[in-house]
Regions:
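Di-metal (Zn2+ and/or Mg2+/Mn2+) metal-binding site signature of metallo-dependent hydrolases
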Residues: 1-13, 82-89
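Short active-site-adjacent helix-start/loop capping segments
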Residues: 1-2, 24-26, 150-151
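Residues at secondary-structure transition points
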Residues: 2, 20, 118-119
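Metallo-beta-lactamase
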Residues: 6-9, 20-78, 83-177
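Solvent-exposed, well-ordered amphipathic alpha-helical segments
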Residues: 14, 66-68, 92
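Conserved beta-strand scaffold positions in the cores of enzyme catalytic domains, especially
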Residues: 15, 56-58, 132, 141
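Generic beta-sheet signal
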Residues: 16-19, 144
Length: 177
């Protein structure tokens, strides 16, 4: 998020963000305290531009939305936990394998931190259980950083996703007659 303003300006594109995270465009630490801002700037040798881009478009409200960017349809799912407005974007590619841009929600073998301002372990667990777990195994996951993976690989090996899946199964209605 720290590079959004310069990228949006350079490529003349809007910044898409969930309404719950809009404040982070100018305040990525989630705090308006001067000391936190100064620490962020010092850590990055004053290379951050902590400002909102000129063109900010809020993602449609609600848990699910569909948008089209450069001719590609995306299913957008609100997936709070790392931040209040975390979202994942699933590129729907027809006969090809779908791709999930997971941001800081899901990584290979891990998940986004929930101990930072705006994070919530409970919301992350719900997002993993209700948004990520039901996805098909073949979906390629491109996280905000780190190596790519697939939903199937994470379902088989990611302890956070496995725990969320077991909670989902425990809450499933008993269909036995």
């Amino acid at each position: 998020i720290w590079s959004v303003a310069p990228l949006a300006r350079e490529f003349e594109i809007p910044a898409l963000i969930h309404a719950d995270d809009r404040y982070r465009l100018a305040d990525p630490a989630g705090s308006s305290m001067a000391a936190a801002r100064e620490q962020l700037l010092a850590m990055t040798k004053n290379s951050l531009e902590l400002t909102e881009p000129d063109d900010v478009q809020l993602l449609p409200p609600g848990r699910d939305a569909e948008i089209e960017l450069v001719g590609i349809r995306f299913a957008v799912r609100h997936a709070p936990g790392h931040t209040e407005g975390s979202a994942v974007f699933q590129a729907e590619r027809g006969d090809d394998v779908d791709v999930l841009f997971s941001g800081d929600v899901l990584f290979q073998g891990s998940i986004g931190r929930t101990d930072l301002p705006g994070g919530s372990p409970d919301q992350m667990n719900e997002s993993l259980r209700d948004v990520i777990w039901p996805m098909t195994d073949e979906i390629v996951v491109l996280p905000g950083h780190g190596p790519h993976t697939t939903i199937g690989q994470e379902r088989a090996s990611n302890p956070f996703l496995q725990a969320a899946g077991s909670r989902r199964d425990a809450h499933a209605p008993n269909r036995g007659w």
